[in-house]
Amino acid sequence: MSSLKWKIDTYEDLFVVGRKLKLSAEEQTQQYRRMVFNVLAENVDDHTKNFSFVMYPNGEWHISPAYDIVFSADPDSHFYRYHELTVLGKRKNITKQDLLLFAQRQDIRNASSIIEEVEDVVMNFKSYAEKVEIDEHWIRKIERVLNE
């Protein structure tokens, strides 16, 4: 997105770009799901270079596959829990109500279900981490932050 020279500081801006590119409602919903994941999973490295679009040969724009999705909350950092992109003007302490209001303003349907699905995935982090053999030290550290 940086090559387009649009100033994007908020998730609202990201959705404006999606509308300008004529993304489908399904893809805008997927963008919303990714935003919810970033908020709930403490992926605060959610800057604009971590969101991309691809143009298909027929000239239609689509969201790219998700990438650079990592746990990035460091309790020892000055920037602990500060998101790069804001949600309703907030970089931290983003609530479920904020996510629902955002969805309403962006005409995203089934926001409550999306939030619940993502919450379930995040709350089951330990089982996913154990399957891919993440060290127990890191599992405990990440779980502590996710459960705060």
Q: Model-found features: residue ranges?
A:
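Anionic ligand-binding catalytic core segments
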Residues: M1-T48, S52-E148
